Regions:
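Hydrophobic transmembrane alpha-helices and immediately adjacent juxtamembrane helices
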Residues: 1-254
Length: 254
């Protein structure tokens, strides 16, 4: 279980990780706010104002921008959490060898740090979504979104931990994961609309691509105002639990 020492360690590592990203820069941690502001603003200007792109059958001029941003922001956190967790044991070897830590919980600081970054980005997006795009979102949908983010980060952490253990034994895992995540990104309808894909690819996506479930839920919230049904969380939690359990078993071999 997490003791007070581990909680303090993870808290300090989380804050340190967040600060280290912008260490030495003039604006410091303000870049955590500046980056999403610039990215979201550029997407809205390019796809809404310049290209006038919108989803088929939608009268909302900003529908494609919402479609893109609502999928891209969570994916960036998911991908970064997974890949960074997979490298944590190697990158923080100096700390692990000096301090007795529980390897199962040690990389949690990455999960929390990326979660904070995601929240900052999404808060600004919701601000733009409501005030400038004139869309509605209620507290229930926001809570639903937070629960989804927690499940996503749990899933990313579980996978990252599994790859992190394998990375100790097989150093090629880091390079493999870079290629794998790139393929996963482009095979997931984040920047393209699912309906343009061949039917055979759509079936594979529905049966194999777990992240597609997250994507559908996020877009259901922002594009349709739908809340997730409770039964949808069960299978995903089970998968994350199985992956995490496998990782914890392998960690005991280290």
């Amino acid at each position: 279980m997490l003791t007070k020492m581990y909680v303090a360690l993870i808290k300090n590592l989380t804050l340190q990780d967040f600060r280290d990203r912008y260490a030495g820069s003039v604006f410091g941690s303000l870049w955590a706010l500046i980056n999403p502001i610039v990215m979201i603003t550029v997407y809205l200007l390019v796809f809404t104002e310049i290209m006038g792109a919108r989803l088929a059958g939608s009268s909302n001029l900003s529908s494609f921008s919402i479609f893109l941003i609502s999928g891209l922001l969570p994916w960036l956190a998911f991908s970064s959490t997974l890949t960074r967790t997979a490298s944590a044991f190697q990158e923080k070897k100096s700390i692990i060898t000096k301090i007795k830590v529980n390897l199962s919980f040690f990389p949690l600081y990455i999960c929390f740090s990326e979660f904070i970054t995601l929240l900052i980005s999404v808060i600004f997006f919701i601000f733009v979504y409501v005030l400038f795009l004139k869309q509605d979102i209620n507290i229930l949908l926001v809570l639903n979104l937070l629960i989804l983010f927690c499940f996503q980060q749990l899933f990313a952490y579980s996978l990252g931990l599994l790859f992190g253990v394998l990375n100790v034994f097989f150093r090629d895992i880091k390079e493999f994961l870079t290629i794998f995540m790139n393929i996963w990104f482009w095979m997931t309808p984040i920047v393209w609309v699912p309906s343009i894909a061949p039917e055979w690819l759509q079936k594979i996506q529905e049966n194999v691509n777990i992240y597609l479930w997250f994507l559908s839920e996020y877009r259901g919230i922002f594009l349709e105002g739908n809340t997730s049904s409770i039964e949808n969380f069960g299978p995903l939690f089970l998968i994350a639990f199985l992956v995490l359990s496998t990782s914890l078993i392998l960690i005991k071999m280290l």
